[in-house]
Structures are given as C-alpha cells and as structure tokens.
C-alpha cells in the first residue's frame, strides 16, 4: 500500500515537472512552485506514513524534470514513470513474499500518525528551507538552483531533529567527495550502455550505505545525479561539479539552521530519551 502511494506521487511529480518545463517555467516561478509542492507533499507523506518520509524524492523528480529540456511527448514521460513504478512494485511484492516464507511470524506494525502540530511544523520547515535555498540559488546565478533545494530537503527528512543536523554536515562532506569522483569519471567517454551499467552500479553502492553511512552513500550517489545531468544537458565538467558543491553547501547550511532554530524542544526530548535508555 505504501509503495503504491509513493509510486503514484512519484509519477505525478515527473509528469508535473515535464509539464512545467514545457511551459517554460523556470527561475523564481519554479522555485515558488517547487516550494509549495514540497510543503503540500510533506503533509501528504506524513499522513500516509510513507517511508522514506517527506517530499525529498518527489521534489527532486519534479524539479529535475522541470529544469532540463524534454523533446518527447508527455505520454512518453508518463509511461516511463509508471513503468518504473510498476517494476519497483513488483520487486517490492516479491520481497514481501520472500519475507513471509523466511519470517512467517514477523508482523510489521504501521507507524502511528504524528500529531497534526508536528506535521504542520515539519511542512513549514520544508517551505522555509527550500524557499530560501532556491532563492539564494537563483540570486547566485548558479546553473542548477534546484540542487540547493534538494540539499535543503534531505536533512529535514532525517529521523529526529538531531539526526537532521548531522545529516546536513554529512551531506556536504559526502557531496564534496562525490564531485571529485564525478570529475574523474567524466574524463572517460562513456557509451550509453556503459553509462547505464555504471549508474546502476553507483546507485547500488549508494543504497548499500545510505542507512548506515550517509556521507559514504553520497560519494556514490552524487555521480549518479551529475552524470545523468551531463548525459541530458552536456556542459563543462568544472562548472557542473562546482555548481553541485556550492549549491549543496547553500542548501545544507540553510537546512542546518532551520532545524537548529525550530527544534529546540524536540532535541531536548531526544536527549532525555537517550539518557533514559542509557541508564
């Protein structure tokens, strides 16, 4: 059920991004629309209790597809999104069947619905952080301001306020290492099929580390985003990696301070809980 809802939101985000790009929406208008979508989808994701939580992946899909040229038809983008979601759902269902065979007595309890005050507060953090990050990205003149918005969304989506602060720092460290790896990989002229296998391998490595070592995961996941961008809209490698590093710094720093300034009570509760568990 949760995967289905997430797949629907992802497909709608892709289609919405393609439509926005087709109308030539960019700059300030795109930042405004993306910020509004992030706030709304934050509420939707929390109400549906989706995991990973928050609008991070949906806003990334929307902003990325809206920011690059698309010469195909809308139905092609929609079909690609729906087909990808379908494959993911089938794989998820197969995993569920396997789990029932290997762990028949295991029951997965659904997470409780958060308090509405917390849901609205979290949505507000996304709106403030992404709005500021996108605005600074536009004013800076860098070429991919939505990267700053994605970098701002990632720490806020972390479990716990303290975890969000740590993730903001890890986001910067991992991205810096990732852009160095990207620069090295882009010295090679990859054929389309070779690039597809490389991206799949990097994505797999990123998923292996994303839960336990977030900064290491970004070393592999950063080249995925940048090499796909380079494939769709080629440009100077130096500009590409510099934009990624700078805009990630903008977004992560903004997220750090938004979390720091709006979660004082929550962080105190987390510290108290950790002390209780330790004792």
Roles of regions detected by a PLM:
Residues 1-220, 228-279:
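Alpha-helical transmembrane segments and their membrane-interface boundaries
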